[in-house]
């Protein structure tokens, strides 16, 4: 009926221990249990998080550079207080969850901007019945990036307290994930949008080896009205991301399964770099075909082909993967991803500087990979070699930049 959590500690700041303690508490109250109603769920929850930073309120009135780099302008207290309130409802396949979060005092959410209060509104609606399910999520956030220590210049993911995932589909195919949404709040302080997800499974319960799975997803995000300190002007919110995609999975028999995916993506490339007053929209259409052939109970072969067509950014791409599995322990694969179209001068994309002539040149590179994995109980070892493209790698709604390199990757996963 009642659940209380209390936590306090000193977080890690990249490779060192931070000097700023963080503490918090969470309270959950199940109203449905208290009323003896067990056919559904009604609950309310509340949380508090505090952060202490010594001398956070000190300003630098005569050193504009220090104000910009250390971001202390407008901070009035060494203690940052944040609260949230949540409500949950579930009944006969319908679920509704809402949350409101508030920063009670001014805080630095971007070192280049003044301190300000922040808030988040998040609403989740879901429905499922037999083989159909639908979900919709809406979120508006403003000034909610919260640093462990806002004074260091390193303001990446390792210096972040709160986890605010991106509400877009997390694609598993390489070309669909070539230009993921990285969030507009990094440069503008806020964003508003959401996504809708639909799923339906068509199957005969008496024939398990044959079925259809249909999945569709749509997401859209806009910036919010804000004052751009970088541009020195008020800026209206605008659309920065649209992704519409659907995929169809077909199990033909016990041996053959196919998947087809289509995705349309449009994004504002300018907002990925700075708070620009104008948009530069890039568009891409992605097509994926995936075939798995099960040879016997232990051996299977999978082939995957992808094509991305675009008149913007880096032009067209093609990709292919061949994978052979020896269940339950071994898997081997070889893949290639090729930027197969040159773009006209002035376009975003595949330009590289010749360090001898200092001129921009086209390079249509192959990003090849060969690798394998071994799995035993809870241990998984994966080894690969190849050329890796520079770009953003997203996992669980969190994106990090990965530089281009050619080399060996070794990954070890052990769960216990």
How should each PLM-predicted stretch be described?
Residues 364-395:
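C-terminal structured domain segments
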Residues 325:
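Residue-level signal for short amphipathic helical patches enriched in basic/charged
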Residues 1-303, 307-318, 328-364, 368-369, ...:
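Signature for the C-terminal beta-barrel architecture of outer-membrane proteins
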